[in-house]
From Swiss-Prot:
Highest taxon, organism lineage: Eukaryota
Signal peptide start-end: 1-17
Listed name of the protein: Vitelline membrane protein Vm32E
Pfam family, one: Vitelline_membr
Keyword Nucleus in annotation: no
Major localization class: secreted
Single Gene Ontology BP annotation: vitelline membrane formation involved in chorion-containing eggshell formation
The keyword ATP-binding appears for this protein: no
Subcellular localization(s) per the UniProt record: Secreted
Disulphide linkage map: none
Record function comment: Major early eggshell protein.
Family: Belongs to the vitelline membrane family.
């Protein structure tokens, strides 16, 4: 343990002796160049367009008290993007799945036969 401590002290002494003296850093950082952009004004809703001017956008109107809890804001039915498949579509789907499984099985058999030596 004494050897480790002695080695550490010697290393610190050599490192300190080999480094040139540097002036201490200032207590506070030097101020940077002033920014060219001023602080933005208070937030405002703007509509952006191709025109050179900006017009404030109107804020949303206060909603009336909902009659159905949180669902009161919705006025239309929930859209259905995919309908229920009919019997023919279900059969086609099952045929495709069966054909894909059969192809995978045949590929596996083909690779097994190629790996065998006669």
């Amino acid at each position: 343990m004494k050897i480790v401590a002695l080695t550490l002290v010697a290393f610190v002494a050599l490192a300190g002796a080999s480094c040139p003296y540097a002036a201490p850093a200032p207590a506070y950082p030097a101020p940077a160049a002033p920014s060219g952009y001023p602080a933005p004004p208070c937030p405002t809703n703007y509509l952006f367009s191709c025109q050179p001017n900006l017009a404030p956008a109107p804020c949303a109107q206060e909603a009336q008290a909902p009659a159905y809890g949180s669902a009161g804001a919705y006025t239309e039915q929930v859209p259905h993007y995919v309908g229920s498949p009919n019997r023919e579509q279900v059969q086609q789907f099952h045929q495709r799945i069966g054909m894909a499984a059969l192809m995978e099985e045949l590929r596996g058999l083909g690779q097994g036969i190629q790996g065998q030596q006669y």
